[in-house]
């Protein structure tokens, strides 16, 4: 009974979120996509709470990088679909996770790196489905996804639910990556990335997308538990510790987020 109540509550919250998205917020996305300008509404820092537009976002990401991130996401969706009926290689999970993590806000705004990652994703897809690239009658089942199809989706509910799925698995990929570098993985978590990415490309109604949104939350909890296990097993359980707050002359090395492995190496 408590589980059922929780699910109903979450569904109502998501429905309320979708119904209250400003019309200008959605209209601007279509306008700026058509004009090839910057538009991103991934994070809570978006300009005017309507999304970042123009030459660059609040985070510093420019239109070219935003477009490359969309292209990378579309390539990841193509790779995920290719793995639907074909076995992965030993590197596919890592490429999916690293690719999603790369598109998280403020992680990587380097155009050359993004371009190289797009190429790596496409090369991995060729290994998974080697015959598709030379097929004389392509079926499109493993084609890279054009993110404009999502941003220009006329149904606001469908567009919003798919966006929630995308942004959710991007954040989950960050947790998964940090656990992975410490040698910890979870097949349930890894498999869900493929499912969620594929669902973004499918022509589905809200009643089919909402359960996937809820599943994002469920799997993310498993991923957070995985990261906690990785960190505590490797470095021990955190305890309150006094640290000096003295300001000293630099230079400094700043370590942020969950990069505990990087700190250990330093």
Predicted regions, residues:
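Short hydrophobic alpha-helical segments enriched in small aliphatic residues
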Residues: 8-10
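Short, Lys/Arg-enriched N-terminal segments with co-localized hydrophobic residues
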Residues: 13-33
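Metallocofactor- and cofactor-centric catalytic cores in central/energy metabolism, strongly enriched
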Residues: 35-265
């Amino acid at each position: 009974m408590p589980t059922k109540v929780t699910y109903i509550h979450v569904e109502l919250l998501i429905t309320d979120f979708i119904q209250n998205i400003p019309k200008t917020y959605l209209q601007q996305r279509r306008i700026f996509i058509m004009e090839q300008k910057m538009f991103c509404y991934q994070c809570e820092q978006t300009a005017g709470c309507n999304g970042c537009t123009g030459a660059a976002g609040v985070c510093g990401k420019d239109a070219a990088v935003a477009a490359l991130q969309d292209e990378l996401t579309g390539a990841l969706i193509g790779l995920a679909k290719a793995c639907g009926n074909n076995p992965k290689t030993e590197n596919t999970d890592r490429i999916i996770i690293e690719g999603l993590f790369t598109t998280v806000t403020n992680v990587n705004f380097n155009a050359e790196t993004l371009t190289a990652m797009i190429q790596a994703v496409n090369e991995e897809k060729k290994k998974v489905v080697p015959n598709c690239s030379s097929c004389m009658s392509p079926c499109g089942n493993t084609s890279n996804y054009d993110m404009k199809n999502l941003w220009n989706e006329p149904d606001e509910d469908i567009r919003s639910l798919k966006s929630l799925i995308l942004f959710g698995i991007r954040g989950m990929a960050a947790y998964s990556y940090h656990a992975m570098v410490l040698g910890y993985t979870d097949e349930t978590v890894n498999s869900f990335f493929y499912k969620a990415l594929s669902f973004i490309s499918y022509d589905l109604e809200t009643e089919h997308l909402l359960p996937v949104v809820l599943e994002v939350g469920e799997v993310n909890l498993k991923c957070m538990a995985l990261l906690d296990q990785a960190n505590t097993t490797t470095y021990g359980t955190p305890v309150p510790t006094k640290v000096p707050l003295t300001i000293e002359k630099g230079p400094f090395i700043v370590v942020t987020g969950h990069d505990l492995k990087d700190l250990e190496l330093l």
